[in-house]
Amino acid sequence: MMEFQEMFSKYQTQYRQLMKSGQHKDAVVPLTTLVSLLDTTTIHQVSPIPEAAIREQKALLLYDLACCYALLGHKRQALLALEHSVEDGYKDYNNMANDNDLRSLRKDKKYQSLLAQVQGRQPIHVLRHSAPYARDAERLNDGKPLFIYQPKESMNLRVVREYFNLDSVAGTGDELSRIINLLHFAHDKIRHDGGNRAFVEMDAIDIYNYCKATGKGVNCRQLALSLCEMYLSLGIPARYVTCMPADPNDYECHVIDAVWSSELQKWLYIDPTMDAWVTDENGTMLSIAEVRERLINDKPLLLCETANWNHETPQTKENYLDNYMSKNLYYFVCKRVNRFNAESMYRDYDPRDDIQLVPVGYVSESQHCEATTDPDVFWAKP
């Protein structure tokens, strides 16, 4: 694996420097070498790198190769490389449509056909063409709650509450202000790093202390799990929700929190990674289900002004909701039991612990996980 990484890094650095300096003819050699390297590698069989990630990287390299050929005036080779890029899943429509490196191809019918394929992969397009939900009469009539919420009086949640002094953090204001204060607290205290999964116990205290001791961040799952425990410790029902894309080869998802508001009588969309919540045009906070529905039907959505990544990058509605979250709101997964340390490293994972909300006809990779097509069942009042 080390040899592969060193070779890949070497040729990647070469071609990027050559492209940056306008030496597109010379950049073709390291680019084709990289494509060949990914074509023949079996590294996904002996490392945590998913095969889908290799294919995605190959699509990006082929796209850059197409740009080089187009700038050199080699139209046939450019279109062939672009076709292979699209076959391997290239999906950045805005980049492809506006990239001046490809301007010599724009009137070509083959280019236009490839661009149309990429447009169909845009997250908002996929979401708007998803199948509808359907009533799940069996579970509705069952009467048993799908989800359980650990009471705040439990010893572990009491420890969380006292450790972080959460009564003081939440404040004495109304319910919504308390929910938002806890969001800000988690966002400020636990840094995000999407590429790092801290190998600690999966509870708010251990995760916080890991960040404090190492100066490192944690992934969105560990952040959302931590904030979920904080809400539960104050008696506010909450779940951390894995928001999933439609594409089974897309290994990137996002995890946020659904927090119950007794005042609004609904689950609220709360994202500790981005310090974010979403409102309608009247300023009313929305649920995850409402955000999804409004994206599908192109209704107004307002992202809170505080939305940011690690206090470094402000978030916009267009980038965060229209692009990123529209990809990750295709289906949802929640834990059946919402509690302290819900994913302990010392417990074996059991797919029966999870419940999914999926569109009609969609079958996810986790076929052993219980699923429903009924949002009323999945988002039932706690």
Residue ranges and their predicted role:
Residues 130-218:
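Secondary-structure boundary elements
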Residues 1-2, 37-55:
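Flexible helix-coil transition and linker loops at the boundaries of alpha-helical arrays
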Residues 296-382:
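Low-complexity, Gly/Ser/Thr/Pro-rich intrinsically disordered linker/tail segments
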Residues 13, 64, 98-101:
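"A position-specific structural signal for the A-helix of alpha-solenoid helical repeats
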Residues 225-299:
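Hydrophobic/aromatic-rich core segments of domains that either
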